[in-house]
Amino acid sequence: MNRYLLTVAFILSALFTNGQTISHDNVQQILSDILTAQKALQGAVILSDMKGNDIASADCRMTKRGPKACKQDFMNIAAEKSKQFSYDGCRLDYVGLESLDIAAKGATVRANRKRHYWGSLTAYYPAENPQYRIFVIMEQNIYNGTYYGVPLCAPVVARIIKSLNN
């Protein structure tokens, strides 16, 4: 599995749970990647609007366990922008999420072999005061149809959330 995809999942997990993270077999390498990325991003703009206006910067304190604390306004902005993108940026009716109040971000990574991909979707449910963090990753060959993260993983996320509501 792609180490960078795990790193992104780890960062998202830590950011949206006030530093509480899941453990990984190679956690030392992942933490090293996070610390390296954070040093490179210190003070850099990491969120801007469609007009190019700066919205938030990388202003997190890091520890060996990951992000210790981030500005609350960044957390709120990130959650709101994620929710807005989820509704405005893709066809939620197409992927089965139209009636669910979620904040989600998808990713697609090409594996080492040609035409071989990992698609993922990280979702927080409900978007306001999330109670659940769901991370779905699926391996797909481009010859088998859809391989982008959102359309590949969203039906699984939808089934998980619907089962939580029953």
Indicate residue ranges for each PLM-predicted region.
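Beta-lactamase-like hydrolase cores
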Residues: 20-50
